[in-house]
Amino acid sequence: MYETRFDIHNIEGDFYNVEAPENNVDSIINVIIGDIVSAKVNIDRSDRSFPANVAKKIEHNMLNSKRRIVLQYKSYSSHIERAYTLAEKNIINGKQSAMELLNGMYCNSLDKYEIDSFEPDIKKVRQHADDIISDVIKQLRKFVYSSANVTQYKEQVEIGLNVVVAHAFVECCVLENPNNATN
């Protein structure tokens, strides 16, 4: 039998050899994803149209490659609304808390691209729109998988992540609202 041995001589900074406490806390987003992925959905891949207000937002933010997650969302839109309604019944401020979390992740992404989150430069947002969405999904993935109540299959979680972020996009918590545009 082989054995791996490590000799650690010096540890600088805080070192905890226990699971992080935030990993033992349930996540509202996981409840939402669980409700979304447990719904029976008929996906029409031939319908690539968007409602006018969503198309306007896609165009305003110049979203390109990540438009596909909005198409994914379209198939699940009624289910996500139902999931948030259920969350609101069971968790005080459930939807608001989830939307605030997603908006915070959006602001973190803006910071990565040196975009002021208080008054975002729409030209810079447009330049990085797809990357910003990807980064929000990445942050949300890390958050979801480190929560205590991950109960779905990985494939379902990945779909749920896309749908939740696309919903936040449609709700104007991620990327910019064309109705607030000055240019």
List the predicted regions and their residue ranges.
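Long, low-complexity, intrinsically disordered terminal regions
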Residues: D35, A39-N183
